C-alpha cells in the first residue's frame, strides 16, 4: 500500500507543478482521481454480487460508478467549460471518500 499511496501523491504533486510550469503557455494540467468503478476487468474477475453491493453502499450517492463516469469527468476537463481550471485533482468516486466504510446498524 505504501508504493500505491506514494505514487498517487506524486501524480497529484506533478499535476500541480506542471500546471505552474505550463500555465504561461496556456496549457492546463489537471488530474482525475477515480474511485472504485465497475469495469470489464472487475467483471472478468467475477466480483460477487455482495462485493458490488458493498461498493455501491460506500458511495454517498448510493450508485455504482462505471468507466463512463470517469470518461465524462475527463471530457469535462478537456472542454472549453473548464478553461479556468488548472492544477486540480478531480475526485470521481460518488462521494466514497467523504465518509468512512459503510456500517451495519447496531
Model-derived features: positions:
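C-terminal helical subdomain
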Residues: 13, 31, 50-81, 85, ...
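Catalytic tyrosine of NAD(P)H-dependent dehydrogenase/reductases that use a Tyr as the general acid/base
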Residues: 4, 12
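Active-site helix of classical SDR
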Residues: 7, 15
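Alpha-helical segment proximal to the catalytic Tyr-Lys
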Residues: 20-24, 83
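Short, flexible catalytic-loop segment of classical short-chain dehydrogenase/reductase
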Residues: 33-44
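Rossmann-like NAD(H)/NADP(H) cofactor-binding core
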Residues: 25, 30, 88
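Conserved catalytic loop/helix region of short-chain dehydrogenase/reductase
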Residues: 1-3, 26, 41
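Short C-terminal tail/terminal secondary-structure segment
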Residues: 75, 86-106
Amino acid at each position: 500500500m505504501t508504493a500505491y499511496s506514494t505514487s498517487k501523491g506524486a501524480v497529484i504533486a506533478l499535476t500541480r507543478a506542471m500546471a505552474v510550469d505550463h500555465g504561461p503557455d496556456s496549457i492546463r494540467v489537471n488530474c482525475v482521481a477515480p474511485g472504485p468503478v465497475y469495469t470489464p476487468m472487475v467483471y472478468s474477475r467475477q466480483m460477487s454480487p455482495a462485493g458490488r453491493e458493498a461498493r455501491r453502499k460506500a458511495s454517498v450517492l448510493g450508485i455504482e460508478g462505471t468507466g463512463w463516469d470517469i470518461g465524462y469527468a475527463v471530457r469535462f476537463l478537456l472542454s472549453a467549460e473548464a478553461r479556468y481550471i488548472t492544477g486540480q485533482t478531480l475526485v470521481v468516486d460518488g462521494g466514497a471518500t467523504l465518509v468512512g466504510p459503510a456500517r451495519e446498524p447496531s
